[in-house]
Amino acid sequence: MNFFPWLTIIVVLPISAGSLIFFLPHRGNKAIRWYTICICLLELLLITYVFCYHFQLDDPLIQLEEDYKWINIFDFHWRLGIDGLSIGPILLTGFITTLATLAAWPITRDSRLFHFLMLAMYSGQIGSFSSRDLLLFFIMWELELIPVYLLLSMWGGKKRLYSATKFILYTAGGSIFLLMGVLGMGLYGSNEPTLNFETSANQSYPVALEIMFYFGFLIAYAVKSPIIPLHTWLPDTHGEAHYSTCMLLAGILLKMGAYGLVRINMELLPHAHSIFSPWLMIVGTIQIIYAASTSPGQRNLKKRIAYSSVSHMGFTIIGIGSITDAGLNGAVLQIISHGFIGAALFFLAGTSYDRIRLVYLDEMGGIAISMPKIFTMFSSFSMASLALPGMSGFVAELIVFFGIITSPKYFLMPKILITFVMAIGMILTPIYSLSMSRQMFYGYKLFNAPNSYFFDSGPRELFVSISIFLPVIGIGIYPDFVLSLSVDKVEAILSNYFYK
């Protein structure tokens, strides 16, 4: 047993080190940037060290557990622990946040506050993925919202206040249901609240009550994931946010919803999940088609990419609803895969906006001639997004397909129907993704304009793009990198279900 508090250090380090930023000189933008990047790198190295030397892959139980009494009156503990399901998102968080701080290099206005908020988000995200206490999970979930709201409302585009208000209304509204579910589960059947994940997993509830809890949690995760029809905050938020914030939103924030769906709804409420799972699959299928057919109608480049995120999260929801080994593993792989691809697309959209100052696709055109590096990277990630074989998106979607087809829970006709509709969604994906590339990069519109000389991406931007591209290719060629983390845990979760 390892008694060193690794997880506490990993969760607390970014926000506590971030609070020291305010002691740095106000005008020292360079010092602030380097300090933030060093903190992020140190955190990423810590996570990697703990993963390599203190984490056993073949053990589906909770590892590196820490349990400290916090508030005695209602038995509230600082309880952390990781398993195969949470290690993937934690590594993804470390990786994407480090690159997002590097992407935020051009920001000079109020840079102390900006970098502090990014580090506060970092703590909230890792805390959510590693907490083993329902109330602690809720607190970490909420810790995420305030930094995002401020990052949106202070460093966003023209309609930033509208989109920030919409974001906070949606997510805070969803969090009310999360809090009600957490308190309901904690207080059920005893005078003393039991907020421990392990105790809650062994607790049995009346079916009606379990369905109510499940539905409450589902609303909270549906806002965050997002699941239609609670997705409308996402395109507005992505359309206005600075691209480094978009990287964190698309890469990590949306994954917290899918993670919560597996961690709480599947693990703690298995009966309700087997009732709701057909509906999840139907909604996921509608979501893929709806978002893929809405996306081509968007003029705003970032909104178009945001709708592609909604479409890709549909695969995760279908995988979670299939209740099979392959389906759930595919969903976990899609979470990681889309974390990389979504973050990269928003980063490249933002860097091209920095140069041409245009956000509407019908005003762009001909950028490829003057910016070949951005063109190459954007095209590569568009291919990854439309699930080109050899890239991570293809493997994830293929495994989800396999999960549906092998699911014994559903009859043959519904399975064929869902697979057919998903296939239509996969055909629509290249349509919006390739037309987006065509409108941006081909033609002569900007090339013929006066002062049409634009700078191509510099070493910093190339480094960020290539750093994200390598794992996308790596997972596409050898998906066991990610699957080996979660495969034992997925089996342990599915052992609660009658269907296998």
From Swiss-Prot:
Where on the tree of life does the source sit, at the highest rank? Eukaryota
What biological-process GO terms show up in the record? ATP synthesis coupled electron transport; electron transport coupled proton transport
State its Enzyme Commission number(s). Answer: 7.1.1.-
One GO CC term of this entry? chloroplast thylakoid membrane
What is the reaction catalyzed? a plastoquinone + NADH + (n+1) H(+)(in) = a plastoquinol + NAD(+) + n H(+)(out); a plastoquinone + NADPH + (n+1) H(+)(in) = a plastoquinol + NADP(+) + n H(+)(out)
Family in the record: Belongs to the complex I subunit 4 family.
Supply the name of the protein: NAD(P)H-quinone oxidoreductase chain 4, chloroplastic
Natural source organism: Platanus occidentalis
